[in-house]
Amino acid sequence: MSTAEVSRLPRRSGGIEVRRGDDGMELVGSHERHLVNETALALWQLCDGQTRPDEMIDAICALFDAPQERVEPDVRQVLDAFARDGLIEWVSGDRGDR
């Protein structure tokens, strides 16, 4: 993991709501709806501006009893998609010695 990744943390964007839609769970903003599966929803909920991506990977592995080598690329891809779609923003990650 690069120094830049360690210093940036994903945080949910404001104005996004979680709703149950006809086809499953949705992340709903002012202009768009994003259908998400259980794993993506769990990941989005971890985007609190305090949790590092590597900690998210560990949490998803534990929650879904899945191996890290399978989870890590998926988590990074979903975080990139969330950022591209405006569902999260990357914030400064100076958390001290947490």
Task: Enumerate the predicted regions with their spans.
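Long, charge-rich, low-complexity alpha-helical segments
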Residues: E32-R98
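Acidic, low-complexity/disordered tracts enriched in E/D and polar residues
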Residues: M1-Q45, V91, R95-G96
